[in-house]
Amino acid sequence: MKLLEIKIESSYDVEDALAYFATEDLKALGTEARRRSDFEQAGWLHDSTVVDMDDIPNLPDELEFIAYFDEETDPEEMVKCFKDKLAELAGYGLKTAPGEISVDYVADQDWNTVWKKYYHVINLSRHLAIVPEWEDYQPAFKDQEIIRLDPGLAFGTGNHQTTQLAMLGIERAMVKPLTVADVGTGSGILAIAAHKLGAKSVLATDISDESMTAAEENAALNGIHDIALQKTSLLADVDGKFDLIVANILAEILLDLIPQLDSHLNEDGQVIFSGIDYLQLPKIEQALAENSFQIDLKMRAGRWIGLAISRKHD
């Protein structure tokens, strides 16, 4: 069996948007990202190894985004869909150039193994490290929590700045055991992080069957079997209130989530948002204010913004 491979040369600005679009809208079997910055940082990440950039084949100027589809998928239709999406993202002021798209077919077994070469240990903080299941790792500190992860076919490996901002927000908020809702869980990484950091209970929601499966499998990989999983759109049909609501999703979807927060957040609860491009921050700020929420902390990594949010108090 072969897979249809769509490669897009673009920028860091649109990585999350392309991954979400490919997985959720186009139902890609999987996605992969090759970032120039990953190779430039290789010395810091991997025992100070010296990397000659000229020796790396087909190194992207910034980002090479790859999506995999069933062999029977119409390549021309997929190219058109991605071109339209890039045009839409450019309309938001995001950098999409060069925007070159190429098509190829690869053997199925290549997808299952080759992409893992680009995914390594991430020492997120003093208290958290993200470790792919196929790598050995000894914690940097005795009490450092390890999140074992096989991202499989779901969105969220821990590599991207938006995921890391969300995890740092969870770590900051978790000063005592909290009830947590992870909205748009993807691979389950944020739900697992909350559990590892001492959450009282965790609910993970997503609209995708693939995400539900990946989150359950990744939780089991970490010996966790009590994260509640619910297939739903955002917090629709979710019962109860939570001390902490976390969402690392696109700004346009966060705008749909904001009106749902009040009925699902405990009185003194907190909200962590990530996935916000700085150009879209004003829209989020306005929507939060209109729904009686305030921003307590802004975090930034590159052009991405993370927010710690609570109710306004007179």
Curated annotation (Swiss-Prot):
Top-rank EC class of the record's enzyme: transferase
Recorded catalytic activity of this chain's protein: L-lysyl-[protein] + 3 S-adenosyl-L-methionine = N(6),N(6),N(6)-trimethyl-L-lysyl-[protein] + 3 S-adenosyl-L-homocysteine + 3 H(+)
NCBIfam families: prmA (TIGR00406)
GO biological process, one term: methylation
Protein name: Ribosomal protein L11 methyltransferase
Function per UniProt: Methylates ribosomal protein L11.
Keyword Repeat: no
Subcellular location: Cytoplasm
Keywords assigned by UniProt, alphabetized: Cytoplasm, Methyltransferase, S-adenosyl-L-methionine, Transferase
GO cellular component assignments: cytoplasm
UniProt-annotated binding residues for S-adenosyl-L-methionine: 163, 184, 206, 248
Family: Belongs to the methyltransferase superfamily. PrmA family.
Stretches assigned to coiled coil: none
SUPFAM superfamilies from the UniProt entry: S-adenosyl-L-methionine-dependent methyltransferases (SSF53335)
E.C. number: 2.1.1.-
Gene Ontology molecular function: any one: protein-lysine N-methyltransferase activity
